[in-house]
Amino acid sequence: KPSSAASDVYKRQVIETSIGVDRVFLSVMAGSYCEETLENGETRVVLKLPAALAPIKLAVLPLVKKDGLPEKAEEIMKMLRFDFRCQYDEKDSIGKRYRRQDAIGTPYCITVDHDTLKDNCVTIRFRDTMEQERVSIDKLHDIISEKVSMKNLLKKIME
């Protein structure tokens, strides 16, 4: 209420609260960036985005560019590409390809090797732990679906 008394002073303040997608995005990106020193002294850059939030869910990597491995890798790519955002890479050594995928935040690398042609299994490499697991190609879709599920991420957060 207005007053003519000189002792009454109005302080005008504006409080702006906002949370936009850009701030959340920056927070997730900053919290996910990691540089690790490996046993051999090299530095490994990893973008540890939660698998459900990673733009590229998996990379399919033939071990070498010969012996029928690229063809088998492309077959696996065709099987997965309509359900997951995938990348195919056959350039450079397998170690360099793993590093490239780590740096862009790809949570899973599917490696097609010579044993794949014999036993119809591939190796899944997990970005965060660098551990590898041999799985049947027939089960690959279900395994990846479970690991990149937003529902499973939210369950983890709520626990």
What is the meaning of each model-derived region?
Residues 150-159:
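Acidic, low-complexity intrinsically disordered tails
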Residues 27-35, 82, 146:
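Short, well-ordered loop/turn and helix-capping segments at boundaries between secondary-structure elements
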Residues 1-6, 10:
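Single conserved hydrophobic/aromatic residue that forms the stacking wall/gate
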Residues 19, 28-29, 60-65, 88-90, ...:
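Active-site proximal loops enriched in glycine and acidic residues that flank catalytic Cys/His/Asp
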Residues 41-100:
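Generic long, charged, amphipathic alpha-helical segments
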Residues 11-30:
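Conserved phosphate/anionic-ligand binding catalytic regions in large, soluble enzymes, centered on
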